[in-house]
A protein has these predicted regions:
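Predominant activation on well-ordered alpha-helical scaffold segments within soluble catalytic domains
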Residues: 21-28, 47, 61, 85, ...
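C-terminal helix-coil-helix/basic helical segment that borders enzyme active sites and/or dimer interfaces
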Residues: 32, 36-43, 54-107
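Residue-level detector of secondary-structure boundary/capping sites
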Residues: 18, 37, 75, 130-134
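Tryptophan-centric aromatic hotspots in well-structured domains and transmembrane helices
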Residues: 1, 27-30, 58-61, 84, ...
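Hydrophobic packing residues in well-ordered alpha-helices of helical domains and bundles
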Residues: 20, 46, 77-80, 115
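Glycine-rich phosphate/cofactor-binding loops in nucleotide/flavin-utilizing enzymes
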Residues: 1-14, 99-148
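Glycine-rich beta->alpha junctions and the first turn(s) of the following alpha-helix
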Residues: 1-56, 125, 141
Length: 148
């Protein structure tokens, strides 16, 4: 667990975080272009996604600060991995909901192709780097002291 815990302790999340921020900006631009930003339910869902992204950023900052101070990350790194994988999966679903069929059929048109790729990849993120179930087991055993 030590190696995997250190792997997830912030630095590996940075490229993902930057990618998520870019995806959020692109989605907001597309939503505005289509006039969907006038719909209260869309604004609410986007606000929830943006808030979740901000939580991810703050958690990552906290983990990186701890590592830079020489503190060995504990189960917090599993919380971070579990959170970002689930956030991105949910964000991928939001992208597809808002962009509709265009995101699936605009095969080579940017940014739709990038959004589709991100959606499909977001499913794999809940598996690689430690499946969500494994992360929950780590949290249960190490953070909550539950038996194996």
């Amino acid at each position: 667990m030590g190696t995997l815990g250190n792997e997830r302790a912030g630095a590996t999340v940075l490229p993902f975080q930057a990618s998520f921020e870019r995806e959020m900006r692109v989605l907001l631009d597309l939503v505005r272009t289509r006039g969907l930003d006038r719909l209260p339910v869309v604004r609410q869902r986007l606000a929830k996604a943006w808030s979740g992204l901000r939580i991810l950023q703050l958690n990552n900052d906290r983990l990186l600060t701890a590592v830079l101070q020489g503190v060995h990350p504990g189960p917090e790194s599993s919380i971070g991995k579990l959170y970002w994988a689930n956030w991105h999966r949910d964000f991928g679903e939001l992208m597809m909901d808002l962009l509709g069929a265009d995101a699936l059929v605009a095969a080579d048109q940017e940014p739709m192709a990038e959004m589709r790729h991100s959606f499909l990849n977001s499913r794999a993120e809940t598996i690689y780097g430690g499946a969500n179930e494994i992360q929950r087991n780590i949290l249960g055993e190490r953070a909550l002291g539950l038996p194996k």
